[in-house]
C-alpha cells in the first residue's frame, strides 16, 4: 500500500545520510531493508532460539528479545551468523504497545482534523491507556512502563534499550540518568515477564 511505498522511498533516501542502520519491527521491513544494516525490535516477537536464528540468517545484526521471555531462557536464545554470535538486547525501559490499529479508537470523540495525535482510552476499571497516532496507525500503550534500570546484569544480554514514546524530552533525560546510575524507579512499573515467564 501507500504507507509501505512511502517507507521504501524514505529508506532509499536515507541510505547515504550517515545512519548506522535501520530498526525493523515488522517482518515486511526485512524485505525493505534487505542488504542494509538492520537491528530487530520487539515487533518481531523474538521469544525463542528458532525465531532468533531465522532473523539472524535473514541479516539482522542485533535483536531485541521480548519482555515475555523468562530471564533463565534469555541466554539460550542468542543466535549465530557466520560463526559469530549476534548481539541480543532487552527492554530496560518503556511503555509497551498493546495494540496497533489503522482504525482510530478516538474518532468518536473528535475527527482527525481536530486531533492533536494523542488521547486516552479508559477501561471499565478506570485504567487509562495512552493512544498515539502517526504514520497512518494508532498505537495503544500499556500505561505502566517496564523498568529494569536498577537491575544491571540481571539478564544475560549484550545491550539494553530505553523505548521513549509518551515521555517529554526532560522526562526521557531523567529516566536515562536513572538507568545510568541504576536508580530505583519512582512510581508504578513492571518487570515484564523477565522473572516470571509465560505458561
Which ranges hold each PLM region?
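Active-site pocket-lining/capping segments in soluble small-molecule metabolic enzymes
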Residues: 1-54, 58-199
Amino acid at each position: 500500500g501507500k504507507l509501505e511505498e512511502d517507507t521504501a522511498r524514505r529508506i532509499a533516501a536515507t541510505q547515504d545520510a550517515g545512519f548506522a542502520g535501520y530498526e525493523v519491527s515488522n517482518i515486511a521491513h526485512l524485505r525493505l531493508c534487505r542488504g542494509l544494516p538492520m537491528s530487530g525490535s520487539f515487533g518481531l516477537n523474538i521469544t525463542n532460539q528458532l525465531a532468533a536464528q531465522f532473523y539472524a540468517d535473514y541479516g539482522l545484526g542485533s535483536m531485541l528479545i521480548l519482555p515475555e521471555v523468562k530471564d533463565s531462557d534469555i541466554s539460550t536464545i542468542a543466535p549465530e551468523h557466520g560463526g559469530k554470535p549476534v548481539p541480543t538486547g532487552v527492554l530496560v525501559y518503556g511503555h509497551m504497545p498493546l495494540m496497533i490499529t489503522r482504525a482510530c479508537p478516538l474518532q468518536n470523540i473528535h475527527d482527525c482534523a481536530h486531533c492533536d495525535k494523542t488521547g486516552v482510552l479508559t477501561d471499565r476499571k478506570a485504567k487509562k491507556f495512552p493512544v498515539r497516532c502517526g504514520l497512518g496507525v494508532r498505537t495503544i500503550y500499556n500505561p505502566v512502563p517496564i523498568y529494569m534500570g536498577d537491575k544491571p546484569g540481571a539478564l544475560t544480554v549484550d545491550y539494553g534499550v530505553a523505548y521513549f514514546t509518551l515521555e517529554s524530552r526532560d522526562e526521557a533525560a531523567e529516566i536515562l540518568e536513572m538507568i545510568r546510575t541504576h536508580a530505583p524507579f519512582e512510581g508504578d512499573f513492571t518487570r515484564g515477564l523477565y522473572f516470571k515467564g509465560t505458561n
